[in-house]
Design a protein with these regions (language model features):
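Active-site anion-handling motifs in enzyme catalytic cores
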Residues: 19-331
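A charged, aromatic-enriched C-terminal amphipathic alpha-helix characteristic of glycosyltransferases
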Residues: 1-20
Length: 331
């Protein structure tokens, strides 16, 4: 309508005037670095929660995200974004930003690779050299293996980081064991716990679009590829078969990171004789959380499926392949 168009234009003009009236500062805004833009629902949920918190503090705050898919990040989150491996793009932003946020997620570990660990440590060191305050936010720490890697990690964090918030106590102990003492360290929680589930109507519509009864009885399984998983897959399938035959629950397999997880979830589903459903991750993390409210039980390897489930009080069981899963369940 005309009134809505006029109202939107007035809002735009007011935003321009408000931002123009702000005093010019030598350094301002936030640059965020994490494993974003890879299609992982857990990492996307972390980013959404961090951005919501920052915008609640100052809706005009300049925010940039280092992403594996900058175009998608700009489109989805309405923030500036540069490629995570383009130092010619992110170094100027480090020089402009007042705060550098490393996290959330398990960035400081070399289970993925020592190259990955060194990359995130290098970005922290660069941000510190550029004059940013450095915060590691909502992080999981470890495992960091190898004495040289542990000493190098402790040296960078002690010299370059101002504040660390952690999602569980196991990470605090890992930092203490490495000798990280200089930053102020607080155990809080994963940022994704702040996300609210989608409305009941939206969740019901999604169920119906996938030929699922919104009032049905379901057990969710969230698997991911991992070394030696094939040796234990039959036990997971037997569990799904048991809850189906004993409690009448339909197994629903969800790929939280579709490009990596879809195949293993399809394989597990194909080993069952009862009806099963295999779903890719939803782009809307809040819809994923809303789905979990309808599950009678959730069995997951993926950490953020466990976090989503706990945020809505859904019964859950973890298949721990990594200390971060064990740490969260203990916390």
């Amino acid at each position: 309508s005309i009134d809505a168009t006029v109202g939107k234009q007035i809002e735009i003009y007011q935003t321009i005037l408000r931002r123009t009236a702000q005093p010019k500062k030598k350094k301002s805004g936030v640059l965020i670095c994490g494993a974003y833009g890879k299609g992982n629902a857990g990492d996307d949920a972390i980013l959404k929660a961090i951005l919501a918190q920052l915008k609640a503090i100052d809706r005009d705050m300049p925010i940039y995200v280092m992403s594996h898919d900058p175009a998608q990040t700009r489109l989805c989150y309405h923030v500036g974004s540069v490629h995570v491996f383009d130092p010619f793009a992110f170094w100027p932003l480090m020089r402009k930003a007042k705060l550098f946020v490393s996290g959330g997620g398990s960035l400081i570990q070399n289970e993925t690779s020592t190259r990955s660990l060194n990359y995130y440590l290098t970005t922290i060191r660069m941000a510190h050299a550029a004059g940013c305050r450095v915060m590691m936010y909502g992080c999981g720490i470890g495992p960091v293996s190898g004495e040289a890697n542990r000493r190098h990690t402790a040296r960078i964090l002690n010299r370059c980081v101002d504040r660390i918030t952690l999602r569980e106590d196991l990470s605090r102990r890992e930092l203490a064991d490495m000798g990280v003492t200089e930053p102020k360290i607080t155990v809080t929680a994963d940022p994704a716990l702040l996300l609210q589930p989608a409305s009941g109507g939206a969740v019901d519509s999604y169920f119906l679009s996938n030929d699922l009864d919104p009032d049905g009885k379901y057990a969710m399984f969230v698997l991911r590829p991992w070394k030696n998983l094939s040796q234990h897959l039959q036990a997971i399938v037997d569990t799904a078969d048991y809850v189906n035959k004993t409690y009448g629950l339909t197994p629903v397999f969800v790929a939280l990171e579709p490009t990596r997880d879809l195949e293993i979830n399809r394989t597990a589903a194909s080993m069952l004789t009862c009806r099963t459903v295999v779903l890719p991750a939803l782009r809307d993390e809040q819809l994923t959380i809303g789905m979990m409210q309808k599950m009678r039980v959730i069995v997951s390897m993926r950490l953020h499926a466990l976090i989503f489930a706990s945020s809505v009080g859904a019964p859950l069981a973890a298949i721990s392949y990594d200390p971060k899963v064990t740490g969260f369940m203990a916390y």
